[in-house]
């Protein structure tokens, strides 16, 4: 399976933080091709490949951002964000409410004639979505607490790029699966596709504690340079993997990754962080 095909399969199921089981059921067959598969109590997917010491843990998070239903109204539902949703981008977005069946919804927006741009951006992480049905009908299908995902998309851009829902962090999962295809080692490797990264890192914390690995590597997305972004805060597209340097990380392992990249002539970039990384590495280091 080529990388684009793998990525399309991985980005297909939703899996809003706290509801990762649906992703597990959809992808279990695919994951079983890579080793012994299980799901732990936190919802994380664990793939084990037996071997000798040192035991290596490789993490990428399975969960995605989304919303949760907080109120059902006549024709509408009120939603609260789950994870790092950028509320500047949600107006008019198409959603799927995961009730007793999947329900289509569209985020409402106040017309520009009736508001200024600043006042239309939610300050508290909530929004209202149009569901096109009465409250009575809606309550037969939707309950407060139901998770809500973004409408799925996967589109090619140019020759070898894509835009897709949930590349954060299904892209990281794709990287680890492809890496496992190429790795030829007798060392024990555990892949952790962790739950609830978007809401506090619960999955990675539990999995790292249970795995008790000798070393760990967390793979997540980062920022690519765009015309209006500060290039000092971003990586360069096609510039190679971004290797993190942070007080929360092992300097020894960061330098090891750089030396390996140099040895095998693999493009890389350094990502310098002055505190926490904002990834599961923060949670793995204390587990």
Each language-model region and where it sits:
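N-terminal hydrophobic/helix-forming segments and targeting peptides
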Residues: 1-287
């Amino acid at each position: 399976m080529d990388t684009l095909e793998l990525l399309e399969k991985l980005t297909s199921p939703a899996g809003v933080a706290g509801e990762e089981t649906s992703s597990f059921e959809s992808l279990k067959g695919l994951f079983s091709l890579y080793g012994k598969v299980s799901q732990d109590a936190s919802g994380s997917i664990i793939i084990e490949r037996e071997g000798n010491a040192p035991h290596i843990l490789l993490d990428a998070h399975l969960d995605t951002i989304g919303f949760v239903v907080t109120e059902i109204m006549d024709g509408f539902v009120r939603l609260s964000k789950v994870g790092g949703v950028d509320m500047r981008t949600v107006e008019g977005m198409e959603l799927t409410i995961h009730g007793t069946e999947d329900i289509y919804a569209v985020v409402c927006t106040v017309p520009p004639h009736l508001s200024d741009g600043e006042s239309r951006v939610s300050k508290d992480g909530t929004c209202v979505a149009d569901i096109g049905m009465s409250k009575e009908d809606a309550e037969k299908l939707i309950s407060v607490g139901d998770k809500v995902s973004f409408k799925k998309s996967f589109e090619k851009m140019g020759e070898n790029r894509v835009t897709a829902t949930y590349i954060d962090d299904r892209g990281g999962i794709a990287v680890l699966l492809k890496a496992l295809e190429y790795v030829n080692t007798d060392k024990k490797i555990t892949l952790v596709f962790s739950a609830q990264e978007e809401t506090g890192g619960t999955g990675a914390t539990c999995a790292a504690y249970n795995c008790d690995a000798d070393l760990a590597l967390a793979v997540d997305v980062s920022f690519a340079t765009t015309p209006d972004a500060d290039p000092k805060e971003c990586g360069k597209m096609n510039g190679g993997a971004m290797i993190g340097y942070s007080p929360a990380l092992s300097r020894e392992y960061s330098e090891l990754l750089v030396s390996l990249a140099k040895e095998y002539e693999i493009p890389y970039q350094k990502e310098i962080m002055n505190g926490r990384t904002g990834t599961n590495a923060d949670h793995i280091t204390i587990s």
